[in-house]
Amino acid sequence: RSSATPRDSIDYPVFDGSVQYKTPRAFTLPTNPGVYLIHDFRGILYIGEAKNIRNRFLQHHRNEENTLLKELVKYPFGDLRFYWLNAETKLKAVKIQKYWIRVFQPITNNIKYNKDRS
């Protein structure tokens, strides 16, 4: 049995924070690497990773290339939130992102990972 606590395990996400998905909230976001997700009452809409969480949040607002995500955040169901988990390195963030996409299968992630391809 693993001695990892839920905080150390990617199986049990414990987020470092969340904000409403609005640009004025950007100043509260960290500038370090991490994994993030965008969520409303439908569930997890998108999972991403970033070397700078704050900059990536702002990029989603300025120039969203994912047309489905763009449409869903324009017309959210209930409270639209941005959650993040700090990661020590970008490599760790990528690993967590791939795993979460496989497990949670968000509807707007274009890349889907399975056990054979990581």
Kindly label every feature range from the protein language model.
Residues 1-51, 55, 91-96:
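GIY-YIG nuclease catalytic motif and its immediate N-terminal context
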Residues 59, 101-108:
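Short arginine-rich
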Residues 105-118:
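Coupling/hinge elements of helicase-like and P-loop NTPase modules
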